[in-house]
Amino acid sequence: MKVVIIGGVAGGATAAARIRRLDEQAEIVVFERSGFISYANCGLPYYIGGAIEDENDLTLQTPESFWRRFRVKMNVHHEATAIHPDSKTVTVKNLENGKILTESYDKLVLSPGAKPIKPGFDGIDSDKIFTLRTVEDTLRLKKYTDEHHPKSAVVVGGGFIGIEVAENLRELGIDVTLVEAADQLMAPFDRDMASFIHAEIRKNSIHLMLDTKVEGFADTDCGIDVKLKSAPTLHTDMVVMAIGVAPETTLAKDTGIELGIKGSIVVNDKMETSIPIKPPPTTTADFG
């Protein structure tokens, strides 16, 4: 049996390891668009602030170590661009040299993950605006702070990532403003619990702006302006957007796989998508 997995970060790498434990003979091939596999996003902000000092500590495995341990072929910088259920093949682009290849499969696992939400605000594509989802995002943000030595930063979004980014930028001595559209940080928390978070944020000299919505951005000669709906414009050296993520399901949608109302992939109790698995012509399947 040959299994192709699209996505090699947390879910994809875990699936590959589990499949290997269940089947020692299976051929397992993973395609990952980024240059890194098997990492947890939770630790990324702490590389920015220096709590994690070594870049290599951000990842649990490399393609080489994964092959040695599990005999799974990890292809980084490879993006799956099309799925062909009728022929049971996947079209893949090598992002390093632009070559296109076709990979066959018996079973296909989708683990595309999520992407940061970036609203269509004016100025959203500024090179002074960052997101933090991948190792590449982290290295880009770290490079910017190391080379440009920003004195101020605005973090938009008061969830886990936003708070952790604000904490770690503050550790660098940066003057940080945390902007949240709701009337509290950490929406899943009760208001009385969130109040403790608010107090801790302020205790660490982070400016907290609640009930404040961002409307757009504008580059300036010496930084970037953050336009707010109900408050004066903030001038800062850099911005980190951390207002949540959305399912990365463009490939699934293009394939005709059913999606839910929020864009995630619909599956049954066996984690199968709306496109059934077709048995090879030489076998007999029992659907009873």
Description of each model-found segment:
Residues 1-75, 166-189:
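Beta1-alpha1 glycine-rich phosphate/pyrophosphate-binding loop at the start
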Residues 69-84, 204-214:
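A conserved beta-strand/loop element that lines the FAD pocket in flavoprotein oxidoreductases
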Residues 59, 139, 152-153, 160-217:
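Rossmann-like dinucleotide-binding cores of NAD(P)H-dependent redox enzymes
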Residues 84-102, 218-233:
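Conserved beta-strand-loop-beta-strand element in the redox core of flavoprotein oxidoreductases
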Residues 110-172, 207, 267-269:
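Glycine-rich dinucleotide-binding loop and its adjacent helix/turn
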Residues 1, 26, 107, 127, ...:
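Nucleotide donor/acceptor-binding cores
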Residues 125-149, 222-227, 233-288:
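FAD-site-proximal beta/loop scaffold in flavoenzymes
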